[in-house]
């Protein structure tokens, strides 16, 4: 997020292709790492003498078995609704901030206009990620709190630098930072305490609150440069927390709801359904944005508005309410799923490690009897 504008503006000639090329390079690096991992894993299997267990062959009837499951559709629809309110929003979020915040031009010779600030912010992001993530696994309380304080201070510095840059992209880049720190905490909580269905509901509630805040509260601070940025930062961070809550509880819940023999096919179908939403809703948001801002479309068509003027003039209220409605539907499915779990005892509210503990206890009893 933070480097895309930097590459797009290299040399003073704006070109999106450079940012896309940077993304392609990252994907190529990831592919190379996967290939290396694949051969290292094969080598380890050969050294240890372990062979992969033969799975049951895939059958077309498995798909029918999965699609005929009522609970599968609850999870799949909750997934597509939630993620369709997150990922398509990211596409429009920077422009939404440009339309709702009051930015001032930064002097070209100012430190805040240099590329060095972007690099410094990226380093700070890494510091936040490392310290917050490491604090989750630190047993020494003094070190744990020291890492947390370091992470919080770094986050405040990052937010201050984003404000001084007067850049919507720098402000929205804070989105994943809180998620990085709390995702391990939430995952550990689900493993040891459970409450996955409750976390799905809470994540959906936070999602609704954030989109409604962007729709109705943020525009009220249009004339307040500091107040608007503060509201934006807080809302984006809370949205990141929601983005941690749902995945941390959703994906570990699937094996509890689907037969283990078709779990791979179930995940594939969920992602397939999710990608349909990720294709459809960006188009829908664009259509709604144009239909609710006819004066901008007309101004661009007859030349009375330049693209630069139009880009900061859109009213995002209706698209944001639409995304909040997706969150409301996800909330309904989450509530239904929790009630169904209470009735059918799928174990969504139970910790994931209980089964292992029971099996371990049974093994100890058998060993003692022998």
Segments (PLM) and residue ranges:
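A late C-terminal transmembrane helix in Major Facilitator Superfamily
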Residues: 260-294
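C-terminal transmembrane helical hairpin of 12-TM major facilitator-type secondary transporters
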Residues: 147-162, 167, 173-178, 196-250
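Helix-to-loop junctions at the C-terminal end of transmembrane segments
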Residues: 129-141, 181-195
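Extracytoplasmic gate region of multi-pass secondary transporters
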Residues: 69-132, 154-179, 183, 247, ...
């Amino acid at each position: 997020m933070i480097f895309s504008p930097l590459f797009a503006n290299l040399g003073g000639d704006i070109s999106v292709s450079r940012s896309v090329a940077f993304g392609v390079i990252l994907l190529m690096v990831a592919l190379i790492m996967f290939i290396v991992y694949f051969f290292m894993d094969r080598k380890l299997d050969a050294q240890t003498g372990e062979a992969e267990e033969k799975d049951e062959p895939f059958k077309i009837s498995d798909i029918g078995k999965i699609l005929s499951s009522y609970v599968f559709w609850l999870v799949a629809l909750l997934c597509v609704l939630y993620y369709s309110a997150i990922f398509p929003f990211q596409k429009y979020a920077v422009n939404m901030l440009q339309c709702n915040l009051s930015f001032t031009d930064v002097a070209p010779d100012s430190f805040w206009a240099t590329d060095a600030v972007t690099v410094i912010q990226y380093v700070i992001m890494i510091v936040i990620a490392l310290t917050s993530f490491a604090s989750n696994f630190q047993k020494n309380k003094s070190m744990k709190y020291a890492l947390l304080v370091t992470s919080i201070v770094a986050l405040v510095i990052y937010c201050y630098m984003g404000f001084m840059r007067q850049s919507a992209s720098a402000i929205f880049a804070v989105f994943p930072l809180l998620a990085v720190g709390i995702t391990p905490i939430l995952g550990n909580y689900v493993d040891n305490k459970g409450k996955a269905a409750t976390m799905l509901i809470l994540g959906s509630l936070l999602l609704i609150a954030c989109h409604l805040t962007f729709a109705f509260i943020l525009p009220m601070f249009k004339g307040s440069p500091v107040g608007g940025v503060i509201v934006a930062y807080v809302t984006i961070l809370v949205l990141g927390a929601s983005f941690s809550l749902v995945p941390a509880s959703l994906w570990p819940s699937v094996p509890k709801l689907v037969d283990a023999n078709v779990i791979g096919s179930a995940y594939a179908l969920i992602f397939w359904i999710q990608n349909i939403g990720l294709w459809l809703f960006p188009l829908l948001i664009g259509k709604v944005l144009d239909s609710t801002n006819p004066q901008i479309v007309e101004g661009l068509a007859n030349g009375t508005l330049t693209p630069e003027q139009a880009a900061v003039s859109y009213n995002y209220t209706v698209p944001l309410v639409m995304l909040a409605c997706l969150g409301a539907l996800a909330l309904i499915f989450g509530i239904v799923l929790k009630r169904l779990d209470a009735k059918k005892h799928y174990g969504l509210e139970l910790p994931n490690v209980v089964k292992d503990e029971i099996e371990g206890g049974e093994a100890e009893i058998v060993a003692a009897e022998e």
